[in-house]
Design a protein with these regions (language model features):
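Positively charged, proline/Ser/Thr-rich regional signature most characteristic
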Residues: 202-280, 323
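Generic beta-sheet signal
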Residues: 47-50, 100, 141, 306
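Short, polar loop motifs at secondary-structure junctions
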Residues: 47-54, 242-246
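Accessory terminal helices/loops
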Residues: 123-137, 141-227
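Catalytic cysteine-centered active loop of the rhodanese-like fold, especially the PTP/DSP P-loop
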Residues: 262-315
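Catalytic core of the metallo-beta-lactamase
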Residues: 1-19, 55-146, 151
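Active-site neighborhoods of enzymes that stabilize oxyanions during catalysis
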Residues: 317-325
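Active-site metal-binding motif and surrounding structural segment of the metallo-beta-lactamase
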Residues: 2-47
Length: 325
């Protein structure tokens, strides 16, 4: 998802993973894919079905093809019905499959627009997904109830649209009478996804903060580079959210730091200047991460955490006031 690329990039960095390929299961209608932006940030390739109608991909996939990574691969299964270009991806040992919007958990993708066809959908699920081993885990593109995985055995038995003894005519009758409203982002998402998520003019609209060299972690917190902070302390407000005895204790504190314990911060944010950046610090970086959430809720647009806190700051031999010598 385009808006989640920063989060996804953070996870890749934290786990020291290299993104080789971004697989789009189809041209989505309810959100814009992050494939293009991920390619801009990581150099990954974009892969999508050759029947999708999308432009700008690096790999166009066909039924029976493979997407290789390391010593493993995903096999490509064409599963149209939601759209013409829907594809599902099955791990080489058939232990798991990624079904896009073809088969959802106790449901399936809609078939009433974007080349949708309930007859085709029924056959795709029955022939390409329900034919997998019972214990094959199924991961759909999304789920509106917060679920993440099911299995072939479960869906074959309990899917209220496609499971059990339901026939093709049963399924077609069900799908033709859903009477769903069109997705809210339809007019934005489909044109963008037909370009693999590339924005107009190929300009990146999600610029990172530029007031300091920051890193966005998977927990959703901006973190500041300690070297930059030491050199530019006068340009920011250093907020120490420890308790008073810690502030004057063995670790000392960063020169010029403002002491506001985390428990009091929500009611004392007016002691800080919203126009100037704030860097939060604590003993090890945990409380100060929560301080960033408090500051953002109070309207501070420029706020970052000092990872590792005073423990790391002291261990690197950086300047402090007070503390043990």
């Amino acid at each position: 998802v385009f808006e989640q690329v920063r989060r996804d990039s953070a996870l890749l960095g934290e786990l020291d993973l290299t993104l080789r390929v971004t697989l789009d299961t189809h041209v989505h209608a309810d959100h814009v894919t992050g494939a293009w932006l991920l390619r801009q940030r990581t150099g990954s390739r974009i892969a999508i079905s050759q029947d999708s109608g999308a432009e700008g991909a690096d790999l166009y996939l066909s039924h029976g093809g493979r997407v290789e990574f390391g010593q493993r691969y995903l096999s490509v299964r064409a599963t149209p019905g939601h759209t013409n270009g829907c594809a599902s991806f099955v791990l080489d040992n058939e232990a798991m499959a990624f079904t896009g919007d073809c088969l959802l958990i106790r449901g399936c993708g809609r078939t009433d627009f974007q080349q949708g066809d309930p007859h085709v959908m029924y056959r795709s699920v029955r022939n390409e997904i329900f034919s997998l081993p019972d214990d094959c885990l199924l991961y759909p593109a999304h789920d509106y109830r917060g679920l993440t995985a099911s299995s072939v055995m479960e869906e074959r038995a309990y899917n209220p649209r496609l499971g059990g003894q339901l026939s093709e005519s049963d399924f077609v009758g069900y799908m033709n009478n859903l009477h769903l409203a069109h997705p809210r982002k339809l007019d934005i998402a489909v044109p963008a996804n037909l370009k693999c998520g590339a924005p107009e003019g190929d300009t990146v609209p999600m610029g990172d903060p530029d007031w300091a060299p920051l890193n966005f972690n998977f927990a959703g917190i901006w973190e500041i580079n300690p070297d930059w902070l030491e050199e530019h302390r006068a340009q920011v407000q250093v907020l120490d959210v420890r308790e008073p005895d810690e502030f004057t204790g063995p670790l000392g504190h960063i020169p010029g730091a403002i002491l506001i314990p985390l428990g009091a911060l929500q009611h004392r944010t007016d002691e800080l200047d919203k126009e100037r950046p704030v860097v939060a610090v604590c003993r090890a970086g945990g409380r100060s991460a929560q301080a960033i959430n408090v500051l953002q809720q109070a309207g501070f647009a420029k706020a970052a955490n000092l990872p590792g806190g005073m423990l790391r700051w002291r261990s690197q031999g950086r300047r402090v006031e007070g503390g043990a010598s």
